[in-house]
Every structure is written in structure tokens, then in C-alpha cells.
Amino acid sequence: MARYRSVCLVAALLGAILLGSAGCQNGAEPAHPAQITAAELAERVGTQAAPLILDVRSPREYAAGHVPAAVNVPHTELAGRLGELGIDKSDELVVYCLSGKRAAMAEQLLEKDGYTSVRDLQGQLRAWQGGGYPVE
């Protein structure tokens, strides 16, 4: 009886392991639903479908190069400047910085303030530049 329980336990554990790894067959990590890739954003920049792009880095970093059409609103000023942007809370927004830390803070602030379509640039500005997309 004890052996039967052990066999059942091992079979159950193996089944759980196999089921848990079924979604990871190709090894690719799925994109976070609140992200947009550099390629997706590049296709939309300059079109009617372009989101409002917020560069939340410092003005100095922004001046050194930014995604075309991006508006510079440093993450430390974002809360006080939301009104001047003239955007609806349902408008699509894309936020980015250099590494993702400031963009994550901005995304959290925007969502807390009721903005419903906030995404961040997957890989941030480094991914944009690494993809060979233009900077202004």
C-alpha cells in the first residue's frame, strides 16, 4: 500500500511538472501585455494610429536623442504636468526611459490617475536604438 502511494505521488508530481512546462516549449518569454515593441511603435510613429509617446527622462537626456514625436515630461514632473498634455484618460500612451525604472514609475502613476491605455516601450530607448530606428 505504501509503495502504491509513492508511485501515485511520483506520477502526480511528474504530471504537474510536464503540464507546468508545456507553455515554455520554445523558450521565448511572452511580451508583457502592457508593452509595445520598438518594431510595433516604429510602424505607428507618424501615422493616425500613433500613440502619445512620453519620454520620461531628463531634458538633457531627451536633447541627446529621443524617439521621433516623443514629448519630454521627466518622471519627477509628470504628476504636476498631466493637465497640460491635453490627453484623454482613454488615449493610448507609450512611456519610455533608458533602462525602464523611470518608465515603470511613470506607468504606475498614470494608471493610478485613471489612464487606461498605458504601455511601455519593451527594452526602452536601448531597444529602439538597437533596432536601428531613428532618433531626433
Predicted regions and their residues:
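Rhodanese-like catalytic fold shared by cysteine-dependent sulfurtransferases
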Residues: A2-L52, P59-E92, L98-E136
